[in-house]
Amino acid sequence: MKKPLIKKLDNAWANKVKEYGMCESCHKTTYLNAHHFYSRSIRVVRWDVPNGFCLCVGCHVFSSKFSAHKTPAEFVEWAIEKRGLDWYEALKERKNSMVKFIDADYDDLIDKINKEIV
């Protein structure tokens, strides 16, 4: 797949996740980031909006008390508590599915991302 298309999908996904409008942890409304629950290296869920969390930069990266990157075990526990076990199981099942994308699928993904309700 071509890099410009990947970048376009990444931007569409991040913008959709940030439409939530505030940090899902501390409720700040500035310096928002889109965080992947499952790594972006797992393409089957890389652009799934439910795989994203809207976090302020502190909760995403910098805080030593709660940070998706500095305290990942606590983040996973918090995410499951926030979104529920059904969300977690459905996303995990999708992550473990064997899907191979072709270039035409990526164009459809942008439409799917844009239609998601946050």
Can you say where each PLM-predicted feature lies in the sequence?
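Arg/Lys-rich, low-complexity, intrinsically disordered N-terminal tails that contact nucleic acids
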Residues: M1-L9, I117-V118
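Active-site metal-coordination segments of metallo-dependent hydrolases
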Residues: K7-K8, R43-W47, S64, A68
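Short cysteine-rich loop/turn motifs with clustered Cys
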Residues: K8-N33, C56
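Short acidic/histidine-centered micro-motifs embedded in hydrophobic/aromatic stretches
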Residues: T29, R40, W78, R94
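Short Cys/His-centered divalent metal-binding micro-motifs
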Residues: Y31, G52-G84
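Short linker/helix segments within small regulatory modules
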Residues: Y38-F53
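Short histidine/acidic/glycine/proline-rich micro-motifs that form metal-
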Residues: S39, F62-F66, N96-S97
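Short flanking/linker segments adjacent to small metal-binding domains or redox-active Cys/His motifs
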Residues: W87-V118
